[in-house]
Regions:
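Conserved N-terminal/central alpha/beta ligand/cofactor-binding core
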Residues: 2-86, 91, 195
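An anion/pyrophosphate-binding glycine-rich loop and adjacent beta-alpha core
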Residues: 3, 17-18, 53, 144-150, ...
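Flavin (FAD/FMN) cofactor-binding core of flavoprotein oxidoreductases
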Residues: 62-69, 152-161, 304-321
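Core beta-strand elements of the Rossmann-like FAD/NAD(P) dinucleotide-binding domain
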Residues: 88, 106-116, 188-191
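A conserved short coil-to-beta-strand element within the FAD-binding core of flavoproteins
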Residues: 88-101
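A glycine-rich dinucleotide-binding beta-alpha-beta segment and adjacent secondary-structure elements
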Residues: 88-91, 265-345
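Glycine-rich loop(s) and the adjacent beta-strand/alpha-helix scaffold that form part
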Residues: 116-162
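Glycine-rich phosphate/pyrophosphate-binding beta-alpha loops
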Residues: 125-127, 155, 201, 312, ...
C-alpha cells in the first residue's frame, strides 16, 4: 500500500458508477454489485472518518492531502487496534476444510480455527513486496479455477531501434491508437507517453496494455498522433508556414520545431529525409510524407514486460466460481475473496484500489 501512487496512495477515483465500470476492462460487470454497495464516495467517507484528509486531483484521482501513503496505512492500523483485531504474523500454507466448509487456516507457525476466511493475497506483481501468488495456489487446492496470471498496466516492448534512440523522452498531449492484426482499433486515448530502452511506457501505454490480452498468434501495432489538435491539412499548412518563414534552414532545424529534439532525426528518417535538406528544397511529396509520419508514428509491439514489472496482475480466481453479491466461493462454504486475487483488473487512476475496498 505504501508504494501505490508513487508513494502517495491513489485511494480511489471520485467518479460515477458508469465511469468506474467502464474503467475495468477485466470482468467489470462482475463487480457491479460490490461497487454499487461500496462506492468511491463511501471509500472517501471511510478514510475521512478515520482522520485522513483527502483531495481530488486531475482525472478525479483521490489522494491524502499530505501526499503520503503512510497516512492511509497508519489510519488502517489504528482502526484495527481500536477494533481489537488479532494480528498473526505468519505465512498461510493452506486452508483446511471439512464437509465442504472452511475449518481453519494452516500457517507455518500455527493453525488458526475459522468458520470464514477472506483470501486477499493480491497478485504476483511487485514480488519484492512479498507478492508470491500463494493465493492462487491456495484457491486452486480448494477446487477453484485459476485464469493464468499476466501483467496488466505494464510497459510494452517494441521492435526496432527507434525507441532506444529516444529513451527517456516523454510526450504529452498525444493521441494513441493500438491496432490488432486485423487493423481493428482495440484501444484509443489521449495523454502522456514515455519512450524507454525497450519500448514504450507511461499512463497511455499502461492503460492500453489492459486491453492487449492475447499475444500468442496476435500482432499489435501502436500508432502515435504527435499533433492531434491538427488534421493533416492544417498540419501541412503549419509545416509549409515554418518552411516559408525559414526557407534557408535545414530540415533538421524545422523538424526540431515540430517535435522534441531527440525525436526529430527519427521522424525525418521515417519520412525519407536526412535533415540536411534546405527547407525551400522540400517537394510537396516530401512534405506530405513528413505530415504522415507526424500523424501516424507507428511502432510494432512484440509483447509486454514481465509480470513482475506490472502495476496490476490480470488473471486469478475465475469470477464465475464466485458469488458477485457476497464474494463468497461457490466451491467452499465460508471462503471469500477480495481484491487482486480475483480475475479482475482496471486502469490506473485509483480504480484497482476501489475494487479492493469494495470487494
Amino acid at each position: 500500500m505504501n508504494i501505490t501512487g508513487k508513494g502517495r496512495c491513489n485511494v480511489t477515483n471520485d467518479c460515477d458508477r458508469e465511469t468506474l465500470l467502464a474503467s475495468i476492462p477485466g470482468n467489470g460487470r462482475f463487480l457491479y454489485g460490490a461497487l454499487t454497495r461500496f462506492t468511491p464516495r463511501d471509500t472517501m467517507a471511510f478514510f475521512e472518518a478515520l482522520g485522513v484528509s483527502l483531495k481530488v486531483e486531475r482525472g478525479n484521482r483521490v489522494f491524502p492531502v499530505s501526499d503520503s501513503a503512510f497516512d492511509i496505512t497508519n489510519a488502517l492500523e489504528r482502526e484495527l487496534k481500536r477494533r481489537r483485531v488479532r494480528w498473526a504474523r505468519d505465512r498461510a500454507l493452506h486452508i483446511e476444510t471439512e464437509n465442504g466448509a472452511v475449518t481453519a487456516v494452516q500457517g507455518e507457525k500455527d493453525a488458526y480455527p475459522a468458520q470464514a476466511v477472506i483470501l486477499a493475497t493480491g497478485g504476483v506483481s511487485y514480488p519484492g513486496t512479498g507478492s508470491t501468488g500463494d493465493g492462487y495456489r491456495i484457491a486452486e487446492a480448494l477446487g477453484h479455477t485459476i485464469v493464468p496470471p499476466r501483467g496488466s498496466l505494464v510497459p510494452l516492448v517494441c521492435a526496432g531501434e527507434d525507441c532506444p534512440a529516444m529513451q527517456g523522452l516523454s510526450l504529452r498531449n498525444v493521441a494513441v491508437t493500438v491496432y490488432n492484426g486485423k487493423k481493428k482499433a482495440v484501444f484509443r486515448d489521449f495523454g502522456e507517453l514515455l519512450f524507454t530502452h525497450f519500448g514504450v511506457s507511461g499512463p497511455l501505454v499502461l492503460s492500453a496494455s489492459a486491453h492487449l490480452r492475447r499475444w500468442e498468434g496476435e500482432h499489435y501495432t501502436i500508432e502515435i498522433d504527435l499533433k492531434p489538435a491538427l488534421d493533416e491539412q492544417k498540419l501541412d499548412a503549419r509545416v509549409l508556414r515554418d518552411i516559408g518563414e525559414n526557407p534557408n534552414r535545414e530540415m533538421g532545424t524545422i523538424a526540431a520545431g515540430l517535435v522534441p529534439h531527440s525525436m526529430a532525426p527519427v521522424v525525418l528518417r521515417r519520412a525519407g529525409l536526412t535533415g540536411s535538406e534546405k527547407a525551400n528544397s522540400l517537394t510537396k511529396e516530401q512534405r506530405r510524407a513528413l505530415v504522415q509520419v507526424l500523424k501516424h508514428f507507428t511502432l510494432e509491439l512484440t509483447g509486454p514486460r514481465p509480470v513482475s514489472e506490472a502495476i496490476v496482475t490480470a488473471g486469478g480466481v475465475k469470477v464465475g466460481e464466485v458469488t458477485p453479491n457476497t464474494m463468497a466461493s461457490k466451491r467452499v462454504r465460508g471462503l471469500f475473496f477480495a481484491g487482486e486475487v480475483l480475475d479482475v483488473d482496471a486502469y490506473t487512476g485509483g480504480f484497482n484500489l476501489q475494487i479492493a475496498w469494495a470487494t
